[in-house]
Amino acid sequence: MSTMRLLTLALLFSCSVARAACDPKIVNIGAVLSTRKHEQMFREAVNQANKRHGSWKIQLNATSVTHKPNAIQMALSVCEDLISSQVYAILVSHPPTPNDHFTPTPVSYTAGFYRIPVLGLTTRMSIYSDKSIHLSFLRTVPPYSHQSSVWFEMMRVYSWNHIILLVSDDHEGRAAQKRLETLLEERESKAEKVLQFDPGTKNVTALLMEAKELEARVIILSASEDDAATVYRAAAMLNMTGSGYVWLVGEREISGNALRYAPDGILGLQLINGKNESAHISDAVGVVAQAVHELLEKENITDPPRGCVGNTNIWKTGPLFKRVLMSSKYADGVTGRVEFNEDGDRKFANYSIMNLQNRKLVQVGIYNGTHVIPNDRKIIWPGGETEKPRGYQMSTRLKIVTIHQEPFVYVKPTLSDGTCKEEFTVNGDPVKKVICTGPNDTSPGSPRHTVPQCCYGFCIDLLIKLARTMNFTYEVHLVADGKFGTQERVNNSNKKEWNGMMGELLSGQADMIVAPLTINNERAQYIEFSKPFKYQGLTILVKKEIPRSTLDSFMQPFQSTLWLLVGLSVHVVAVMLYLLDRFSPFGRFKVNSEEEEEDALTLSSAMWFSWGVLLNSGIGEGAPRSFSARILGMVWAGFAMIIVASYTANLAAFLVLDRPEERITGINDPRLRNPSDKFIYATVKQSSVDIYFRRQVELSTMYRHMEKHNYESAAEAIQAVRDNKLHAFIWDSAVLEFEASQKCDLVTTGELFFRSGFGIGMRKDSPWKQNVSLSILKSHENGFMEDLDKTWVRYQECDSRSNAPATLTFENMAGVFMLVAGGIVAGIFLIFIEIAYKRHKDARRKQMQLAFAAVNVWRKNLQDRKSGRAEPDPKKKATFRAITSTLASSFKRRRSSKDTSTGGGRGALQNQKDTVLPRRAIEREEGQLQLCSRHRES
């Protein structure tokens, strides 16, 4: 006991010595409250905070005033009663008068000027979130615009994708619109229509009539009480509060005068403890107390200003204290967890979801700060319905956009009477055509006039089928700019917008795209695709290289070197056969001794044998006789068989099964991967193919080359290939294969790449997307898509490439006929040479015979004279005279021919040793004839 007394005395002594060190720091907290009762609650909350924190270093002190009737008095009261007391923060509630919305404003302006934090208790106007106006304002309640988060969550829970946003054109309405649109963008969606009206307007009928024409049946309303009442009255007159409609509103729209006219079934929101000023006082004091203790632990803390004295009295620590307050997390609040966002607004607020039933508000769910938890069994929807409305009406008149792309969509002009010409398909069925409006010319720079035209093809048949199945009508128009759709910058800014069919769909000019629109990720981020109605990929179109048959086509199976070797082999083998048979002792033989020996194999016969074996023409005579030569003959026959068989096989490959050589092998062809100006290839500008090449890093080199040569449309590019202005065109395989089957000078080459499909495009919130996909799947199952494919895509006018033998034409075999003609000409030429040679040889033989006959007669006469006969026989003398006369005249003709042929020099006979007798022989014969003549005369 004595020890305790000593400690107490020591403590009292130390405090008396250093009193300042023992006294707690007084922290004043100001408040502007609605009533004296709330001032008492404020003081009690401060005392509770002192007890809760239990720190002897800090003592919170409450300083409060009530609301003043006008803004000037309120500002003066803040300066004289609160700031003069060096308050660290000021709490302010909403004034009790409903129409006085701006009472917190003078408090916020005055305290904010000196950087003193202000905590709003029940103020929910969105203007206080603007920190350029209210620098130091925080609040323990969320603004009205935060109700958009609850609406957005309810849309997600009930799968409502079609909404109409009806807002007043004031700060509150614009804030709600901005927040909801931001949330919808994160979900890649948007409101079907945003309708604004001026605050205080008394007539919104025209606006609601516009809303009634839309598909959406979920209406979100943000307006004041009086404006909401005006909207409710007009909606009831237009029958927009009955079955099928959904009304989502906030707290103001089901309060006061608005509740009197609100339709049964409406769903509204009420902030839990939103008007419980005492609860918010307790939570605000707790947040400030927690922040003060955290602030005073820091260094260089200055005291708040003492009074409103110019701009030199700004609290330097005020911004720091505000940041400490905004980062506070007060978990044990009466109204729940208290936290602030970057604008100083309350986060994680809890709402009650209220349903108006029989003119009474019934709670049918809650929002716990992150999720909506509804009680669907308790909800009564407009019109007394108990089933959740689907939130949209199915429009029976759809705007269809398409594009000219054969064979999917053909476009032809109408007849003079505005109708379409009757045509028939390959199956004999009439072609189904629809009237479509669109520009008569989509080429760049040309004047465009929207005119009615006739559309038909694969996609039109599909559209007619879908309309019949899903019970809707349609109006078709061609895309204005002739493009499928890609994103492009607007006025060289960073903002991008879609053009083509994509742009028309997203802007609301069309409800559906029925065209060969390629499904890709970039487009799927903005629109909804149906299941593919046609699977395909990308391929390459080139001009077909038609082979030109030359006269030497029959020689193509062998190279020139091989032909030379075969020809050389024929003659070498012939010479070897001749030599072997010549030198063999068995080259000539006879069957028995009585027969004469057979002739040996001559060089001519050997040559004939060699060629005959090679050409399989049969050997009638001149076969080798010796065993060695016959061995060579058999080997040569085997060689000839192999050569002929190889030639025949290759000849069939070159002439019968010949196909045009494809110019490129596919996307990995070196001419594509390593582009040059000698080989130009391209695709269509701003198409899915263009996007594909632009997005692929490994194809960047190809894209840079293609970008300079891309065409406006596929039809232009295909014609450029046919005109040899473009070497290769990369496009959808379904289109290019059809073009190749219709235009026989074109061919597709290479394997498919970038496999994808064609789908029907709809907006993200389209009510038709599920039904369209189901209808397409059923069409695949029942064979309808296969029938369309056969009718429009796979129909071929050109012969398809196959492995069946092709028919030979004269061009293929012209060289063979020329070879025969050459043989005939050579034979005729040689026969004349043979005739001339034969005549020359016969004349020479006759001359020799006459000469020998004359010599024989002379010898006979000489022998007779020697034997004693005086006179020769007169007949013999006459014969001898005739022979010598003929022989002499013959020699004279030869000599004169020789003289005329030798002109001024040596004659041709001197250069031809085998055509005339030697000069000496002629002179010797002439001498003998002269001797015979003299002897006869003697």
From Swiss-Prot:
Outcome after substituting I643V: In NDHMSD; uncertain significance
Impact when changing F817L: In NDHMSD; decreased glutamate-gated calcium ion channel activity
Intramembrane region ranges (chain numbering): 605-615
Reaction catalysis annotation: Ca(2+)(in) = Ca(2+)(out); Na(+)(in) = Na(+)(out); K(+)(in) = K(+)(out)
Ranges of the Cytoplasmic topological domain: 581-604, 616-627, 836-938
Sugar-bearing residue positions: N61, N203, N239, N276, N300, N350, N368, N440, N471, N491, N674, N771
UniProt-reported outcome of changing A653G: Increase in glutamate and glycine agonist potency; mutant channels are activated lower glutamate and glycine concentrations
Cellular compartments annotated: Cell membrane; Postsynaptic cell membrane; Postsynaptic density membrane; Synaptic cell membrane
Effect of substituting D552E: In NDHMSD; changed localization to the cell membrane; decreased glutamate-gated calcium ion channel activity
Residues involved in glycine binding: P516, T518, R523, S688, D732
Assembly and oligomerization: Heterotetramer; the NMDAR subunits are modular and harbor tiered domains that function in concert to regulate opening and closing of the cation-selective ion channel pore. Forms heterotetrameric channels composed of two GluN1/zeta subunits (GRIN1), and two identical GluN2/epsilon subunits (GRIN2A, GRIN2B, GRIN2C or GRIN2D) or GluN3 subunits (GRIN3A or GRIN3B) (in vitro). Can also form heterotetrameric channels that contain at least two GluN1 subunits and at least two different GluN2 subunits (or a combination of one GluN2 and one GluN3 subunits) (in vitro).
Function field: Component of N-methyl-D-aspartate (NMDA) receptors (NMDARs) that function as heterotetrameric, ligand-gated cation channels with high calcium permeability and voltage-dependent block by Mg(2+). NMDARs participate in synaptic plasticity for learning and memory formation by contributing to the long-term potentiation (LTP). Channel activation requires binding of the neurotransmitter L-glutamate to the GluN2 subunit, glycine or D-serine binding to the GluN1 subunit, plus membrane depolarization to eliminate channel inhibition by Mg(2+).
This protein's domain notes: A hydrophobic region that gives rise to the prediction of a transmembrane span does not cross the membrane, but is part of a discontinuously helical region that dips into the membrane and is probably part of the pore and of the selectivity filter.
Family statement: Belongs to the glutamate-gated ion channel (TC 1.A.10.1) family. NR1/GRIN1 subfamily.
The name this protein goes by in its record: Glutamate receptor ionotropic, NMDA 1
Taxonomic placement: Eukaryota, Metazoa, Chordata, Craniata, Vertebrata
